[in-house]
């Protein structure tokens, strides 16, 4: 009598294909080479038609006659025939993925940002970006320029800065001797000396020294401001203005003066402050010739001349 006995594994059941001979028994009634004490063998039913053995239904633990399929194994046996050709004495392991069973995998969401800054609550999708951001709060600036010693919190900012040392500045202002890499930058700078603001907004009348600045301003009249502060509800027409404003809520001051250590949230104020150390006063009043380090101070000063002129006209 032969028996096809399924055994269990961690993946799926193992099936014996082909006949299996019963091992001869020793004089003590145990199989050769096995343990001496064996559990009593279950009672086997008589052989079915053609001398074929009955088999154990693995799912229910009952005996089934030859020729019939086990419960729930109709599709399994078909797949075994297709993917695993029958060979005598071959054990076939059927894995769940071979049968097309779904295997759950954790999904990675592209917009998931599980790393949170403990200082301001901003979220990031990886620890590297979080560490770079946290340098704003800690003031850490590990990337140092080899030419001038200036330090930066990001390596990309240091690389951008080092290009300044590599590029020559051919265009020099005759008024203050400041040099520029592009002629257009020199022209814009000279307009500041003259107090000229040739680009005027046709809606509100505000004037600007650069056409690009006028274009940014003009959008505030024509388009709804798309950048809205979630803290106070104030809206802005461009991301740079929104970024400067948002730092007033977070307290971030990423621009640090290397001379005195003073920090600023706005790069324009930072640039104006640095002129005080260099003694630069590029903004000149065309009426009295007085110079200023900030364009806003020049405009405020020029209003005094307009007031004097208005007083003369009234008298």
UniProtKB/Swiss-Prot annotation:
It is found in: Nucleus. Its main location: nucleus. Residues 33-58 have a biased composition (Basic and acidic residues). Disulfide bonds: none annotated. SUPFAM superfamilies: beta-beta-alpha zinc fingers. There is a cross-link at residue 113 (Glycyl lysine isopeptide (Lys-Gly) (interchain with G-Cter in SUMO2)). The keyword DNA-binding applies. Keywords: DNA-binding, Isopeptide bond, Metal-binding, Nucleus, Phosphoprotein, Repeat, Ubl conjugation, Zinc, Zinc-finger. SMART domains: ZnF_C2H2. Residues 1-10 have a biased composition (Polar residues). PANTHER family: KRUEPPEL-LIKE TRANSCRIPTION FACTOR (PTHR23235), ZINC FINGER PROTEIN 384 (PTHR23235:SF142). May be involved in transcriptional regulation. Belongs to the krueppel C2H2-type zinc-finger protein family. This is Zinc finger protein 691. The gene is ZNF691.
């Amino acid at each position: 009598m032969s028996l096809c006995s399924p055994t269990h594994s961690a993946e799926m059941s193992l099936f014996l294909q082909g006949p299996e001979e019963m091992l001869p028994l020793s004089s003590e009634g145990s199989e050769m080479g096995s343990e001496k004490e064996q559990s009593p063998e279950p009672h086997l039913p008589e052989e079915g038609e053609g001398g074929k053995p009955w088999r154990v239904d693995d799912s229910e633990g009952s005996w089934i006659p030859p020729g019939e399929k086990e419960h729930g194994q109709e599709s399994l046996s078909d797949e075994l025939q297709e993917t695993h050709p029958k060979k005598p004495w071959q054990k076939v392991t059927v894995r769940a993925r071979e049968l097309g069973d779904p295997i759950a995998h954790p999904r990675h969401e592209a917009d998931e940002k599980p790393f949170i800054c403990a200082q301001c609550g901003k979220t990031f999708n990886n620890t590297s970006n979080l560490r770079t951001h946290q340098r704003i709060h800690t003031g850490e600036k590990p990337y140092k320029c080899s030419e001038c010693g200036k330090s930066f919190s990001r390596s990309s900012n240091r690389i951008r800065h080092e290009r300044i040392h590599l590029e020559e500045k051919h265009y020099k202002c005759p008024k203050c001797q400041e040099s520029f890499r592009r002629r257009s930058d020199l022209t814009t700078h000279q307009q500041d000396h003259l107090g000229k603001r040739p680009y005027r907004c046709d809606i509100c009348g505000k004037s600007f020294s650069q056409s690009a600045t006028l274009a940014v301003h003009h959008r505030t009249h024509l388009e709804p401001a798309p950048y809205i502060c979630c803290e106070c509800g104030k809206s802005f027409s461009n991301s740079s203005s929104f970024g400067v404003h948002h730092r007033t809520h977070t307290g971030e001051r990423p621009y640090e003066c290397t001379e005195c250590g003073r920090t600023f949230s706005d790069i324009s104020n930072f640039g104006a402050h640095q002129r005080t150390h260099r003694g630069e006063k590029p903004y000149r009043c065309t009426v009295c010739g007085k110079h200023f380090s900030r364009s806003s101070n020049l405009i405020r000063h020029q209003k005094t001349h307009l007031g004097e002129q208005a007083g003369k006209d009234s008298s």
